[in-house]
């Protein structure tokens, strides 16, 4: 694809110093555009990144037997009244609630527990119909009083929410723990190192839940972890500030050998064991093998693809721009031509024919401007075709400083092998 016809181009204007790194780089590089505080358009580059993130999530969830669907975002009040959450003060603070012209009350979705349970009530009759594992990717709305930090905290954002329904607590936790492990794999494939942190259930459940946190100085969350300086200690203690009862420097309550340290972090996922709260409230039961009516055991699991994109930029950047992990980059190659356009066209065609995604900067601007734009956009590889390189191609990785001269076949082999390794 040619950059000369790509929409939009990167921007040259300066941004406020207090703007978050993810907002500054994503807006400047043309990945997103801000409509208002907490609401962003995913431009073509940003859309490609989020789609790559979604595809990784989708692949791993499908392996667990989960099925994808799509549910409404506009919810009638009566379904939420069944659980009492419509009038819950904590819910009312974040849920957009309003009346239509007939006076009927509705809410914009910030989650889908009630909607899934309502669906199960129509579809589930006996234990033979369970378990059920369904998920969707959809826009969520939250009346966020602190819509800041770029796309890390918004009023409107993309969320993947998975829901599982089971015949027993044992079966629920079996799948819950499987998803916990799958989340770690998902984040690893995306390129993020995460900590699994015990947390409160918030407005979802009175049980403790688990969050997946990325360490970052710009994070709004505070977590407390066991500082295992002794390599023989394999303690995994980690809690967020809402449930941790101690302070920095305390002895670890789990291993009693190490001390507790606090850190700032960005939450990129969460999972909730909901139990039978929703099925009992909404009167959704199944018939067991002995003919008895039993409540469904329920759990929910969230990941925010747009928040992940913001977290990636906060973690992977330098003073020149973004450094995308190879698994989620919008294009693998940024191709630069310096007065050898015919040759560049041929190389671009060969690369695309080999299944490599290329953005070809064919604009009539200086080499320095093209190189700066390559660094800003942050694709894994920059290729340069020029008189100086002869019949070779200058090959440079975004997160490295070395420049190599490679043949086209070598480039295809190098990039192709790396792309294949990540799938």
Can you say where each PLM-predicted feature lies in the sequence?
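NTP/phosphate- and nucleic-acid-binding module
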Residues: 1-423
């Amino acid at each position: 694809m040619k950059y000369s016809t790509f929409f939009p181009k990167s921007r040259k204007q300066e941004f406020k110093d207090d703007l978050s790194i993810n907002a500054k780089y994503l807006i400047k590089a043309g990945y997103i555009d801000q409509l208002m505080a907490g609401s962003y358009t995913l431009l073509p580059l940003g859309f490609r990144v989020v789609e790559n993130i979604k595809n990784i999530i989708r692949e791993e969830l499908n392996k667990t037997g989960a099925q994808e669907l799509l549910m409404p975002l506009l919810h009638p009040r009566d379904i939420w009244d069944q659980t009492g959450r419509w009038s819950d003060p904590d819910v009312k603070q974040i849920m957009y609630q309003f009346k239509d012209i007939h006076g009927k009350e509705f809410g914009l979705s910030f989650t889908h527990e009630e909607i899934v349970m309502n669906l199960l009530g129509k579809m589930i009759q006996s234990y033979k119909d369970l378990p059920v594992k369904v998920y969707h990717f959809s826009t969520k709305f939250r009346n966020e009083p602190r819509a800041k930090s770029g796309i890390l905290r918004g009023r409107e954002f993309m969320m993947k929410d998975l829901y599982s329904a089971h015949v027993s607590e044992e079966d629920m936790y079996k799948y819950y723990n499987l998803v916990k492990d799958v989340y770690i794999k998902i984040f690893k494939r995306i390129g993020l190192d995460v900590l699994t942190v015990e947390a409160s259930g918030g407005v979802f459940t009175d049980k403790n839940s688990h969050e997946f946190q990325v360490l970052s100085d710009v994070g709004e969350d505070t977590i407390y972890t066991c500082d295992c300086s002794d390599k023989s200690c394999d303690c995994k203690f980690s809690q967020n500030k809402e449930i941790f009862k101690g302070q920095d420097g305390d002895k670890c309550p789990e291993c009693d050998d190490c001390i507790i340290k606090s850190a700032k972090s960005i939450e990129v996922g969460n999972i909730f064991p909901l139990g039978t709260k929703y099925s009992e409230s909404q009167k959704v039961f199944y018939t067991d093998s002995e003919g008895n009516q039993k409540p469904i055991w329920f759990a929910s699991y969230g990941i925010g693809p747009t928040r992940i994109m913001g977290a990636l930029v906060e973690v992977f950047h330098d003073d020149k721009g973004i450094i995308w992990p190879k698994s989620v980059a919008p294009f693998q190659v940024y191709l630069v031509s310096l007065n050898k356009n015919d040759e560049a066209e041929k190389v671009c065609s060969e690369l695309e024919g080999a299944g490599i995604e290329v953005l070809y900067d064919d604009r009539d601007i200086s080499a320095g401007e093209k190189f700066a734009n390559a660094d800003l956009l942050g694709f894994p590889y920059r290729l340069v075709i020029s008189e100086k390189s002869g019949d070779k191609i200058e090959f440079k990785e975004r997160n490295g400083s070395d420049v190599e001269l490679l043949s086209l076949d070598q480039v295809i082999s190098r990039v192709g092998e790396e792309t294949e390794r990540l799938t």
